[in-house]
Amino acid sequence: MFDPHILDSPAVIFDNGSGLCKAGLSGEIGPRHVVSSVVGHPKFKTPLTGANQKKYFVGEEALHRHEVLQLHYPIERGLITGWEDMEKLWKHLFEWELGVKANDQPVLMTEPSLNPRETREKMAEVMFESFNVPAFYLSDQAVLALYASACVTGLVVDSGDGVTCTVPIFEGYSLPHAVTKLYVAGRDITEHLTRLLLASGRTFSCVLDKALVDDIKEKLCYVALEPDKELCRRPEEVLREYKLPDGNIVPIGDQLYQAPEALFSPEKLGIQNPGLSKMVSCSITKCDADIQKTLYGEIVLSGGTTLFQGLDDRLLRELEQLASKGTPIKITAPPDRWFSTWIGASIVTSLSSFKQMWVTSADFKEFGTSVIQRRCF
């Protein structure tokens, strides 16, 4: 029997990303736990440990043991592809990170724009049937990021680890026909930076593994306002120093702006798709002429890959050339944008009016998985 009072409990919020899963409780200012979206399974069974051997490891624990584990990434390019591992990840978040019982509190999960119907229904099925949650809701990541900026109409530029997308939103609803996606994001920029550093001829006293290159990227990379002019600058003007884990200092130059350039020029990675600025312009052009000006005036950045210094200035400069002459353009770059989707979810689930939005276990029992299509949009 469904108890309506359970909807008064703070909701559990999972923001599922290709690189990171963010978990926490409704009404809080940020996620309590941020875990790498990875599950590791032992490569070998060791007879000595026997029954005590863990069957799998999650997040950072898996990454630290990567030599003896087979690593699985259950979310690829924003979409869940490994369901068994995803369940393990959610179980870990409920029990070990948050320390809550899944059947005690409602659960809101975020989803990418254009999430396939079968994926949405499977998420609901797993939550209700495997975890016995009392109530569930699916919410678009871009819409939530816009809510975090106190807006209901605007265009969200969201770039995380696996996918970059531009999502126009009108009065709280995304406009699916105008969403554009680019499969160049944080992971690709890290890989590109690795290749550029190796090709630079510099010697590194440490192995350039993903964690190290991620750190270089996050600390030193930037988006050039005019990449052609950047190329003409004297080497000493662009050189930055990076301290390796062994204490050695290595100078790094042009690679620091060349790697993120792939967001604006995907052809650098052999991908024949429009770059970020053209994506925004294309998304807005596909919308009703009446709201195009409003969308240009409320562009919001979201996701960790939009944190590069100079990205907002470059985007603004290029959009001024693409938009109709005299169109006012405003780009908002919230400082906490790497988890603005989670913040938006925390805000929306705290509203008393949200209670009527939940899909309850009773609804699921009565209507089955299709209830998600009707109620979560």
From Swiss-Prot:
It is found in: Cytoplasm, Cytoskeleton. Keywords: Cytoplasm, Cytoskeleton. The keyword Cytoplasm applies. GO terms for cellular component: actin cytoskeleton; cytoplasm. Its main location: cytoplasm. It holds the Pfam family Actin. PANTHER family: ACTIN. Belongs to the actin family. This is Actin-related protein T2. The lineage of its organism: Eukaryota, Metazoa, Chordata, Craniata, Vertebrata.
